[in-house]
Amino acid sequence: MCKGLAGLPASCLRSAKDMKHRLGFLLQKSDSCEHNSSHSKKDKVVVCQRVSQEEVKKWAESLENLINHECGLAAFKAFLKSEYSEENIDFWISCEEYKKIKSPSKLSPKAKKIYNEFISVQATKEVNLDSCTREETSRNMLEPTITCFDEAQKKIFNLMEKDSYRRFLKSRFYLDLANPSNCGSEKQKGAKSSVDCASLLPQCA
């Protein structure tokens, strides 16, 4: 017959209490981890969770409008990544970041990093530049200034504008945002003022 807890030795009771304490701690830790994980996922999509339909339509007016909007840039980058050709937009972004450098001492190392990654013969993400622009940019590396990539950046922008930007506007990456009602959601059919960018375009996160 079961004698209950009173019949158990003191050492067994202590072990049982220890086990209960450990299990309680692990369960509490698990709940905490799940909460933090859920919170992190929400944080990731808050950047471009909603974008107005008016703004999405502006993306079709010019490449400049598209890539100067945070979610627009993310959508375009995701599209280029799907085509394995994201080096152009990566170069453009790097040039924009480079032009924001305030300290003159940081210009040279950053310029060399961009040059080695996108322009040199052995570049890991070589962009498609004509020989004249490539040579001019190479000369600029002797004494890097804040404008040393301007010509190369302009050429790559024009290249994207004439080619990949036009394909992007015909792709699902843009069309699902421009016409959310096509996704089959009845709620979205009535919501003309804005669209849930995070649900239609996970790559924005």
From Swiss-Prot:
SMART domains: RGS. Keywords: Lipoprotein, Palmitate, Phosphoprotein, Signal transduction inhibitor. Pfam families: RGS (PF00615). Gene3D superfamilies: 1.10.196.10, Regulator of G-protein Signalling 4, domain 2. A lipid is attached at residues 2, 12, 95 (S-palmitoyl cysteine). It comes from the Eukaryota. One of its GO terms (biological process) is negative regulation of signal transduction. SUPFAM superfamilies: Regulator of G-protein signaling, RGS. Inhibits signal transduction by increasing the GTPase activity of G protein alpha subunits thereby driving them into their inactive GDP-bound form. Activity on G(z)-alpha is inhibited by phosphorylation of the G-protein. Activity on G(z)-alpha and G(i)-alpha-1 is inhibited by palmitoylation of the G-protein. This is Regulator of G-protein signaling 4. It comes from Oryctolagus cuniculus. The lineage of its organism: Eukaryota, Metazoa, Chordata, Craniata, Vertebrata.
